[in-house]
């Protein structure tokens, strides 16, 4: 197994069996980190494109909720959710890019496949050497989580969601789960937690933690964000 920088001129993925993996929640102070792994049977690729499947960042949340059930019917898929409390525990020993790989492996490990795969395809979110290092760290036999290994070569692509229907599907399913988890948090605490990590989010968080002593920051947000919030 090797990590290979994707070159569209050398590798045609349209007629290949691909598992695409993508994550959501990296840029959100509140909520979990969610990754999805998706395999699209060759005969369903065009159907998904005709439905309007594309990078989740380019479509509305209502369209996400419309597309997700259709994607699930046409694919093999698995989603892995790192809730804030778990994310914060792991972040004491792992950086943000490492936790992306952790979530990717979690999603891939739960994926049930009945076809031989040609490639795994993910976004090139760091250098090739660094991504390989993250992978080796979490697939080490001594690591507590026994993740399934990538048996196939892994393609690393810039803006993979725009290149691969599998990664686009993964981004939508991950976003759907992220929205679900945020809605659950809203209901549990009777708040409307904002997305992103803007100054408005910082102001919301500052007011929230001053007024709601029953809400522990590590249970609802990613403490790795340098928000400098006074309580």
Residue ranges of predicted features:
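Acidic (Asp/Glu) carboxylate-rich active-site/surface patches
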Residues: 1-19, 23-34, 38-231
């Amino acid at each position: 197994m090797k990590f290979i920088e994707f070159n569209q001129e050398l590798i045609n993925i349209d007629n290949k069996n691909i598992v695409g993996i993508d994550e959501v929640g990296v840029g959100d102070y509140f909520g979990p980190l969610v990754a999805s792994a998706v395999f699209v049977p060759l005969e369903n690729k065009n159907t998904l494109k005709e439905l309007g499947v594309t990078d989740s960042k380019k479509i509305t949340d209502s369209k996400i909720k419309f597309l997700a059930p259709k994607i699930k019917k046409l694919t093999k898929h698995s989603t892995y959710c790192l809730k804030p409390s778990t994310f914060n525990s792991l972040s004491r020993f792992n950086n943000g890019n490492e936790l992306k790989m952790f979530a990717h492996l979690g999603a891939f490990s739960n994926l049930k496949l009945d076809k031989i795969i040609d490639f795994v395809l993910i976004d090139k979110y760091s250098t090739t050497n660094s991504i390989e290092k993250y992978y080796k760290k979490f697939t080490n036999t001594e690591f507590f989580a026994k993740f399934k290994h990538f048996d196939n070569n892994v393609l690393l692509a810039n803006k993979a969601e725009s290149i691969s229907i599998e990664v686009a599907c993964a981004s939508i399913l991950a976003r759907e789960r992220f929205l679900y988890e945020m809605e659950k948090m809203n209901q549990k605490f009777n708040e409307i937690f904002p997305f992103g990590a803007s100054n408005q989010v910082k102001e919301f968080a500052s007011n929230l933690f001053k007024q709601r002593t029953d809400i522990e920051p590590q249970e609802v947000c990613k403490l790795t964000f340098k928000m400098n919030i006074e309580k």
